[in-house]
């Protein structure tokens, strides 16, 4: 009995040690981790809907941070961001308070021109450091020797949806982190410009009607540029599980995470 008791205690201590190591690594159970060409880790934290955190080389990169959209997010637990990217002006993507909570004088905020205009004088503290950059479709920016971003089109093409995301207003982004290419599509349908994307490792594609894509459109979009991994996101109640079947035998891995 004593031997059994000791064995139980040792097992518990081992589990506690493992849990401590996981916590100290900074990666939660909600993170997916990839490796760049030089062996650096890139991790993704799936916050909700269209909001992500990407961690790379000690940097925090926030995508479309939004506080109030349910479930409400406490961005203070993430610390200050090094980079914030905003795709467009809609409430589930653009949140001035979230940007303020995540920003300090070192934070670089990149958004489309409409959102830059909407920041307004209340957020002048961001502009005084010259750390707010408005990008338009087709523009590129070098953020560091090993980090660059391209602003790419994101818009609706179905006739009765074009008012939601008109062509030329909103951005998608292609982030290059030490050669790992990540496509954040923003709110878009399967537009022809997607066929021009190249070397995409990871793609986040939206999937909800009437604002973005159906599962069938998403599958068609993915086949246009063949990323290694596709994450459906921004999907609300859309049955995204069917994307697995739609992309079966395509060579594209589908990963579904909690991004309603």
What residues fall within each predicted segment?
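Active-site-proximal loop/helix segments of hydrolase catalytic cores
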Residues: 75, 155-223
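Pre-active-site segment of Zn-dependent metallo-hydrolases
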Residues: 30-37, 47, 51-89, 93-100, ...
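Active-site neighborhood of phospho(di)ester-bond hydrolases with catalytic His/Asp-centered motifs
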Residues: 62-65, 81-92, 110-113, 183-186, ...
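Binuclear metal-ion centers of metallo-dependent hydrolases, dominated by the metallo-beta-lactamase
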Residues: 123-147, 219, 223-260
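Active-site environment of divalent metal-dependent phosphoester hydrolases
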Residues: 69-70, 90-94, 116-119, 139-142, ...
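Zn-dependent metallo-beta-lactamase
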Residues: 2, 6-57, 249-250
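Beta-strand-turn-beta hairpins that frame and shape the catalytic cleft
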Residues: 36-43, 55-61, 140-150, 176-182
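Active-site HxH/HxHxD metal-binding segment of metal-dependent hydrolases
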Residues: 72-140
């Amino acid at each position: 009995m004593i031997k059994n008791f000791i064995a139980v205690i040792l097992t518990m201590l081992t589990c506690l040690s493992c849990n401590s190591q996981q916590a100290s690594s900074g990666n939660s159970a909600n993170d997916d981790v990839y490796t760049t060409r030089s062996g650096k880790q890139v991790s993704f934290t799936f916050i909700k809907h269209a909001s992500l955190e990407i961690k790379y080389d000690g940097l925090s990169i926030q995508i479309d941070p939004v506080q109030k959209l349910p479930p409400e997010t406490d961005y203070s637990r993430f610390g200050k961001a090094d980079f914030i990217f905003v795709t467009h002006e809609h409430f589930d993507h653009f949140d001035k308070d979230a940007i303020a909570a995540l920003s300090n004088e070192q934070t670089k905020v990149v958004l489309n021109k409409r959102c830059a205009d909407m920041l307004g004088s209340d957020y002048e503290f961001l502009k005084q450091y010259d750390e707010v950059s408005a990008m338009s479709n087709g523009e590129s920016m070098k953020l560091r020797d090993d980090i660059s971003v391209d602003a790419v089109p994101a818009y609706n093409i179905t006739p009765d949806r074009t008012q939601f995301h008109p062509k030329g207003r909103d951005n998608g982004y292609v982030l290059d982190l030490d050669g790992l290419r990540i496509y954040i599509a923003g709110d878009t349908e399967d537009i022809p410009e997607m066929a021009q994307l190249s070397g995409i490792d990871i793609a986040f594609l939206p999937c909800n009607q009437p604002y973005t894509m159906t599962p069938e459109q998403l599958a068609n979009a993915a086949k246009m540029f063949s990323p290694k991994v596709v994450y459906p996101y921004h999907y609300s109640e859309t049955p995204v599980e069917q994307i697995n079947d739609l992309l079966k035998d395509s060579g594209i891995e589908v990963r579904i995470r909690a991004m309603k």
